[in-house]
Amino acid sequence: MTLLAIDGPAGAGKTTLAAKLEAEFSAHSTVRTIHMDDLYDGWDGALGSALTQTLEELTLAHLSAKECTVKFFNWHLMKFDREEVITPTDYLILEGVGAAQAVVRKAGATTYWLDIDAETGLKRVLARDGAHIEKEMRQWQIQQSIHFDLDQTRENCEFKLTS
């Protein structure tokens, strides 16, 4: 059971890297990618203790080859609206802001940090998701920076890449 976590600022290319790794690994193994966007409790509660608890449950279940039930957030309804049973796979890839936080590193994940400057990251996100979220994204950039500083995510990731 291999656990990978891809973290870094919004717009850095974490989802793209996760998709490439999943495609490569799935040729010979079972793989599941979990996107942090699906686990966040909206904009304001995204990087709090609920995410940490969910990640702890996910990583422990994965390493024990057990199932884990996870709540998924619906961004259109702005609430959690479904649960899914995550079954054991050979590889579990966690990707998104907060994916490589301390609880995941403690579980022995191979961790990747993708870096990007804030303005380029913002431009990429707005091109992908729409200009209507610019206000939320600017606040998100502050939240993610605080999270990264407190958690020392970048400093503790094994592999550092720049996009």
Name every feature range the model reports, one short phrase each.
Residues 14:
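Conserved lysine of the Walker
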Residues 32, 38-92:
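Conserved nucleotide-sensing/catalytic segment adjacent to the nucleotide-binding pocket
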